[in-house]
A protein has these predicted regions:
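C-terminal motif of bacterial Sec signal peptides marking the signal peptidase cleavage site
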Residues: 1-3
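Surface-exposed, low-hydrophobicity interaction/linker segments
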Residues: 12-80
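Ordered hydrophobic segments in well-structured contexts
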Residues: 50, 88-92, 124-126, 138
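Mid-length scaffold segments of soluble, non-membrane domains
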Residues: 73-120
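Helix-rich interaction surfaces within compact, conserved domain-sized segments
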Residues: 112-186
Length: 186
């Protein structure tokens, strides 16, 4: 990531922060941080869960994972954490205006990624809105987060390149649930 900033350590966590210039000239603050490993125990689907970071990057989660795709409505984190366990990256946003241009840039990044080398299929990426997010854009990988004030394609591409691979060596190339049409947790 270009800009100012650097690596640091905060309570045993590694962090990297930078200010980058987006293609349209806006300044974007980007923070990448390692997070404590919250484990990978399973609870029942739709049980209430709490996490150590926002966005979450590990912890107790549901036995089912969300299908790797783009969603127009929020996906419960219990499903998304299971995606991370299988090596996926979750990209989430909280934009009161819907940020259609930024979502389009995110989709363009995802569409342009090389296939997953272990699956021969598209990379395991979930893109979804998240109204609980306390920043405009974020990404999670297993025990890593990226938090940013705007969508910066290079920052997200670098994060994906660095952290795409979770602790579970099972390929989990496909499958997953998509309950968005009927409601994730009735």
């Amino acid at each position: 990531m270009a800009g100012c900033g650097g690596l640091g350590s905060n309570n045993g966590r590694t962090t990297s922060d930078a200010q980058v210039q987006t293609a349209d000239g806006h300044a974007c603050n980007v923070v990448v941080a390692s997070q404590p490993n919250g484990g990978h125990l399973h609870s029942s689907d739709c049980d209430p869960l709490t996490f150590a970071s926002n966005p979450p990057s590990s912890g107790t989660h549901y036995p089912d994972w969300a299908k790797y795709k783009t969603y127009s409505a929020p996906v419960p984190w219990g499903f998304l954490i299971h995606c991370l366990e299988h090596g996926a990256i979750d990209i989430v946003y909280n934009c009161p205006d819907g940020c259609p241009d930024e979502v389009s840039q995110a989709q363009s990044l995802i569409d342009g990624l090389a296939p997953d080398p272990g699956c021969g299929a598209p990379m395991k990426i979930v893109l979804a809105p998240d109204p609980s997010l306390d920043i405009r854009w974020a990404a999670s990988a297993w025990t890593w987060t990226l938090r940013t004030t705007c969508f910066d394609k290079q920052a997200f591409a670098s994060f994906i390149a660095a952290y795409y691979q979770g602790p579970d060596t099972e390929a989990a190339c496909g499958g997953g649930l998509d309950l968005s049409a009927i409601g994730w947790c009735p």
